[in-house]
């Protein structure tokens, strides 16, 4: 098991690819910091991950488009897990409409979540990665 005992941070962990990555990492023995902007879904993670020990993971509310939120999550992961080995930047959103119908403000939010968040994640996670 290549990730056994490693600490991973997964953004967008409450659904889609993030949830699938979380389950795979837990299956392989990693300890996982699950982050998502959706507080309600995060509160269901204990039920959704009931086949895993709750000591294997911890959830964090996280707006990946916010630099301050990244700083807070990274600080908490370092306190709660002691280190970080793996970063999975899987949070993402879509336009929800065709480009002609999309307001520019919506496009900027998509850009912040899908691109800027990867920069922020790498910027703040890298210094504590072992």
Protein language model features and the residues they cover:
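Canonical Rossmann dinucleotide-binding motif of NAD(H)/NADP(H)-dependent dehydrogenases/reductases
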Residues: 2-33
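Conserved glycine-rich Rossmann-like NAD(P)H-binding loop of the short-chain dehydrogenase/reductase
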Residues: 28-45
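The beta1-alpha1 cofactor-binding region of Rossmann-like NAD(H)/NADP(H)-dependent oxidoreductases
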Residues: 39-40, 61-72, 104
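A glycine-rich helix->loop->beta "capping" turn
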Residues: 52-56, 76-89, 95
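Substrate-binding pocket helix/loop in short-chain dehydrogenase/reductase
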Residues: 98-99, 106-111
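A short, exposed helix-loop element centered on a Lys and neighboring polar residues
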Residues: 122-123
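Helix-to-beta-strand junctions that scaffold the AdoMet/dcAdoMet cofactor pocket
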Residues: 129-130
């Amino acid at each position: 098991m290549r990730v056994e005992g490693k600490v991973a941070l997964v953004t967008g962990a409450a659904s889609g690819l993030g949830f699938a990555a979380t389950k795979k990492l837990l299956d392989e023995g990693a300890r996982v910091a699950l982050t998502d902007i959706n507080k309600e879904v995060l509160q269901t993670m204990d039920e959704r991950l009931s086949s895993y020990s709750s000591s294997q993971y911890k959830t964090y509310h996280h707006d990946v488009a916010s630099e301050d939120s990244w700083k807070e999550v990274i600080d908490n992961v370092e306190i709660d897990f002691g280190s970080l080995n793996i970063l999975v930047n899987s949070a993402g959103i879509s336009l929800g409409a065709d480009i002609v119908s999309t307001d520019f403000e919506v496009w900027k939010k998509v850009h912040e979540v899908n691109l800027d968040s990867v920069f922020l994640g790498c910027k703040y996670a890298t210094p504590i990665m072992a």
